[in-house]
């Protein structure tokens, strides 16, 4: 599944001989390195202090009981801080800096550009009427997942009580936060409203269900009474938010289009991509065509073998009901063993565990398939959460070969390789340990999704599925999905394609149900620039692999390449590529140690 058209190589660096005694690329200990690290830390922790919901997503639990008060004045404060950080960054001397220091400066600049454009150009806070209630609920859900379990990892009863007090405190402040944030929604968008209303409809299921059930057994009667009061007030505020959306959404215009020039600027300045939207669409069309071709080959083989595509050629139907969660855990264990026995990449002994859970209803409208929440950046908790939405009927999902509902062993293995081992869970767990603060805090979707997508076909080639055909078919299905996404994304963002046309195109090219296609296209429209990460990231990774093999010659191995690749953080390939190639003179153990991997 290689991309087969010529684009200029995105690496530009002096040739480095593998046999040379190249100096390590570990960041220098001079004033430049120190200044960059200090600035990165200041940006991260100051922003988290100003935005407690962001702090929670990072695992900075000291802010878990707090909420900001959204306002235009707060936005002006944020913008002033960003401009100040940009001045500080520009003042750091780079003329004699190491490659790592220069790259860290590029990464910080890209981060600040993204922050600034969010306030001055994108202005999502003006468009999304459901964001206030949804964002609070998302944060409470993260806190719920991170609740200390007394006796585990040294957690005490006092730790658990404190965590619950923070949940109650945040819930109590939520109605005020929601009201203040709603006042900033001066240009609500139709699609934002439609999708947002669907998300808000699922909030009571979580707040009044799983969260309340946990509170009943874990807090004192006095705290439970306070919890119920705060919960009910939050549910009422969110219900009011939903009613307002439902009453007016039909009259709101579509306002998710950003324009092609702005989209290309995002790729260049924020994602550090050497491609325009036109380049991305060419890649995507190639990927889509290749997915259809592979599917045709597999169908032909199945016809000749008189073996139907599906569970009979995919390791058997997965069990339904409560047994499904345990089945997923067994498949992740199988993947972990396969990665080790096939020497795919170094699996660190310190790696945490994956907990398989059902996707909350309030997240399902924009996340109908599987997803992974890797361990939070600064949390002591090393558990990753693998979200699945169990099919209403595995048998019915199998009949329609539903790409979003993993119904047999091999499909669960394929998705598990992407989401967990060696995909997002393992890669994210390694990245958060990086000693360079700039690298530790990187969150490049292009790198993360490129690595996970690359692994899907890799496992087919390495023989994980033996002679079974369904995994090959499924891999081709998802190559089509990634290609279709990367076509729809720039077309929607530029305004060249409207929502209805995009849904029709997407449904035809992916085989998704109409409802799943609507959800997928809505997510693409409202979060431009993300879904191209799979296509572009895999392309850049494979191009880097080709350069690595050329440099290393007979000494090249996939194990060495993969382990080196995961030693630079969740960082754009424009940064990782040159650094990895320049580091080839260093022993693998040295590179891995420099990343605290």
Regions found by a protein language model. Name each.
Residues 6-17:
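Bacterial N-terminal signal peptides
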Residues 1-4:
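Positively charged n-region of N-terminal signal peptides that target proteins for export
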């Amino acid at each position: 599944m290689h991309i087969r058209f010529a684009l200029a190589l995105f690496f530009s660096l002096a040739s480095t001989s593998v046999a040379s005694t190249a100096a390590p690329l570990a960041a220098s200990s001079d004033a430049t390195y120190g200044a960059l690290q200090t600035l990165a830390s200041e940006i991260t922790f100051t922003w988290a202090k100003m935005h407690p919901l962001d702090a929670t997503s990072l695992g900075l639990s000291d802010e878990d009981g707090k909420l900001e008060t959204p306002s235009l004045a707060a936005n002006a404060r944020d913008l002033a801080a960003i401009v100040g950080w940009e001045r500080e960054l520009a003042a750091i001397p780079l003329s004699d800096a190491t490659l790592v220091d220069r790259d860290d400066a590029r990464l910080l600049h890209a981060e600040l550009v993204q922050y600034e454009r969010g306030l001055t150009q994108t202005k999502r806070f003006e468009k999304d009427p459901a964001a206030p209630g949804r964002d609070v609920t998302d944060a409470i859900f993260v806190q719920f997942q991170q609740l200390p379990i007394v006796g585990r990892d040294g957690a005490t009863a006092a730790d658990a009580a404190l965590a619950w007090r923070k949940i109650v405190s945040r819930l109590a402040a939520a109605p005020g936060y929601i009201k203040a944030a709603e006042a900033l929604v001066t240009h609500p968008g139709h699609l934002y409203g439609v999708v947002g209303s669907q998300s808000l409809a699922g909030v009571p299921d979580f707040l009044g269900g799983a969260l309340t059930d946990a509170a009943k057994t874990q807090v004192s009667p006095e705290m439970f009474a306070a919890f119920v009061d705060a919960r009910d007030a939050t549910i009422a505020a969110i219900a009011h938010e939903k009613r307002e959306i439902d009453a007016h959404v039909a009259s709101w215009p579509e306002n998710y289009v950003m324009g092609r020039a702005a989209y290309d600027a995002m790729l260049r300045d924020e994602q550090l991509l050497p491609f325009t939207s036109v380049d991305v669409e060419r890649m995507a069309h190639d990927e889509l065509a290749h997915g259809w071709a592979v599917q045709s080959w597999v169908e032909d083989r199945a016809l000749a073998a008189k073996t139907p595509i599906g569970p009979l050629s995919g390791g058997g139907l997965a069990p339904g009901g409560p047994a499904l969660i345990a089945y997923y855990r067994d498949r992740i264990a199988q993947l972990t063993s396969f990665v080790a026995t096939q020497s795919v990449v170094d699996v660190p002994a310190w790696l945490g565990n994956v907990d398989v859970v059902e996707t909350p209803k309030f997240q399902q409208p924009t996340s109908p398939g599987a997803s992974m929440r890797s361990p939070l950046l600064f949390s002591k908790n090393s558990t990753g959460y693998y979200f699945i939405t169990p099919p209403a009927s595995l048998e019915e999902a199998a009949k329609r070969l539903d790409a979003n509902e993993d119904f047999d062993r091999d499909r669960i293995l394929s998705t598990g390789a992407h989401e967990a081992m060696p995909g997002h869970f393992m890669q994210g767990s390694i990245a958060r340990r990086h000693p360079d603060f700039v690298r530790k805090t990187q969150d490049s979707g292009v790198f993360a999704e490129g690595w996970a997508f690359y692994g899907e076909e890799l496992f087919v080639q390495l023989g994980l599925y033996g002679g079974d055909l369904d995994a090959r078919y499924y891999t081709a299905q998802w190559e089509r999905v990634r290609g279709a996404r990367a076509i729809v994304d720039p077309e929607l963002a530029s305004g060249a394609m409207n929502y209805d046309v995009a849904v029709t195109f997407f449904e035809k090219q992916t085989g998704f149900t109409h409802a799943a296609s609507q959800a997928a296209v809505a997510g693409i429209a409202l979060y431009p620039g993300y879904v191209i990460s799979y296509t572009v990231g895999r392309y850049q990774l494979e191009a880097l692999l080709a350069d690595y093999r050329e440099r290393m010659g007979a000494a090249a191995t996939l194990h060495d390449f993969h382990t080196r690749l995961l030693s630079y953080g969740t960082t754009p390939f424009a940064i990782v590529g040159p650094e990895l190639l320049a580091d080839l003179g260093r022993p693998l153990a040295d590179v891995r140690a420099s990343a605290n991997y």
